[in-house]
Amino acid sequence: MKASYQNHDLEMFFSTNLAQVDGAVNAGIEAELNRQNQQIELIASENIVSKAVMQAQGTCLTNKYAEGYAGHRYYGGCEHVDEVEKIAIARAKQLFQCEYVNVQPHSGAQANGAVMLALLQPGDTILGMSLDAGGHLTHGARPALSGKWFDAVQYGVNKDTLEIDYNQVRELAIEHKPKMIIAGGSAIPRIINFAKFREIADEVGAFLMVDMAHIAGLIAAGEHPSPIPHAHVITTTTHKTLRGPRGGMILTNLEDINKKINSAVFPGLQGGPLMHVIAGKAVAFGEALEPDFKIYIKNVISNAKVLAEVLQNRGCDIVTNGTDTHLMLVDLRPKGLKGNAAENALERAGITCNKNGIPFDTEKPMVTSGIRLGTPAGTSRGFGNDEFKQIGEWIGDVLDGLAANPEDNSEVEKHVKQQVQKLCSRFPLYQ
């Protein structure tokens, strides 16, 4: 009887689906899918992956421990996951035209941390972009590890153009002699001059690290200059504009740096890689090598320009007066609004974005004077210029309504939400 019970139990273990095993978690997943279906996603760091990428992540590869690298694992039974990881690496090398790639970092932050572990010592000076100017926490912000372990100096933007102040970068580099200069960020709407950054880095003998997390898809599609010829090392996430699973990656053309990076990722910073996620990365890189991906990225940029233009026509102040990329920053001060209030109002109307600091912002990070908007997810869904024109008008309606009636903007929000849901019903996800 006991053996029979165990056999039945095992049969259930391998065959019972999530809804039957854990209704609470399944309900949360179903609710999130419903939210994604019914809301317009404008968070610039989010995107929508293909069904194939999701399927790759939900496979038996989640069972496999594979510490080390292909051909040099600390566990047996890795011959098949070795092949998957090698596919991911080969596709990434082809996509970005570089010599060496590490696809094991669990996130962009882990990738950045691994580079610093490989090339720096605690107490070394780093020069990165300040958060309020458009940088990222991992580029030397005080609350982050990079701001605690290193002497972090921050550059910003020109007060007139609100674009990267390369003169300031050079002046700070000459003054502080950083061991590493970091280019890239989380809210930069204009093209980055990587050649100029390398010129400055060479002048002071610094490593140049480029964090291309937000623009990796644009670079892969040839719609933004590549940092590969200029940077000593490049990091990225694999989601955002690359439209892959949530994860990180490190690239370089230099063999000596590659060896240090590999040692820093494992065993320096991580243990076993997430092989199911690496499988998803491989699938996404394969998708990005297809001609359709170039069309997709062109549409992302075109949609961003359309959205920025509509918002400007509605009286919004767009930082740098437009965008070259997938994202834009909206300065809400002329409308008398705060970023957190605008984010909440737009979400009530079915449009998700994030509050965001703007250059020289005096508000706290949980308040802010702006919002950040991006077009990757909407474009993945199938929205084109016409849809983004309408979305821009809806955003204008909500912001104007909030400015006129900050205590109760419910009528405007309710009306916009109804229209948003009608639009979303025409572009369903995962049907």
UniProtKB/Swiss-Prot annotation:
CDD domains associated with the record: SHMT
Modified-residue entries (N6-(pyridoxal phosphate)lysine), positions: 240
EC number: 2.1.2.1
Subcellular location: Cytoplasm
Binding residue positions for (6S)-5,6,7,8-tetrahydrofolate: 131, 135-137
Catalytic reactions on record: (6R)-5,10-methylene-5,6,7,8-tetrahydrofolate + glycine + H2O = (6S)-5,6,7,8-tetrahydrofolate + L-serine
Source species, domain of life: Bacteria
Gene Ontology CC terms, in alphabetical order: cytosol
Keywords: Amino-acid biosynthesis, Cytoplasm, One-carbon metabolism, Pyridoxal phosphate, Transferase
Pathway noted in the entry: One-carbon metabolism; tetrahydrofolate interconversion; Amino-acid biosynthesis; glycine biosynthesis; glycine from L-serine: step 1/1
UniProt-annotated site: Plays an important role in substrate specificity, residues: 239
Pfam hit, one: SHMT
Keyword Amino-acid biosynthesis among UniProt keywords: yes
GO molecular function terms listed in the Swiss-Prot or TrEMBL record: glycine hydroxymethyltransferase activity; pyridoxal phosphate binding
Gene3D superfamilies: Aspartate Aminotransferase, domain 1, Type I PLP-dependent aspartate aminotransferase-like (Major domain)
Swiss-Prot/TrEMBL GO biological process terms: glycine biosynthetic process from serine; tetrahydrofolate interconversion
Cofactor(s) the protein needs: pyridoxal 5'-phosphate
Family annotation (SUPFAM superfamilies): PLP-dependent transferases
Complex formation: Homodimer.
PANTHER family for this protein: SERINE HYDROXYMETHYLTRANSFERASE (PTHR11680), SERINE HYDROXYMETHYLTRANSFERASE 1 (PTHR11680:SF35)
Function according to Swiss-Prot or TrEMBL: Catalyzes the reversible interconversion of serine and glycine with tetrahydrofolate (THF) serving as the one-carbon carrier. This reaction serves as the major source of one-carbon groups required for the biosynthesis of purines, thymidylate, methionine, and other important biomolecules. Also exhibits THF-independent aldolase activity toward beta-hydroxyamino acids, producing glycine and aldehydes, via a retro-aldol mechanism.
Matches recorded under NCBIfam families: PRK00011.1
Family classification: Belongs to the SHMT family.
The protein, known as: Serine hydroxymethyltransferase 2
Gene source species: Photobacterium profundum (strain SS9)
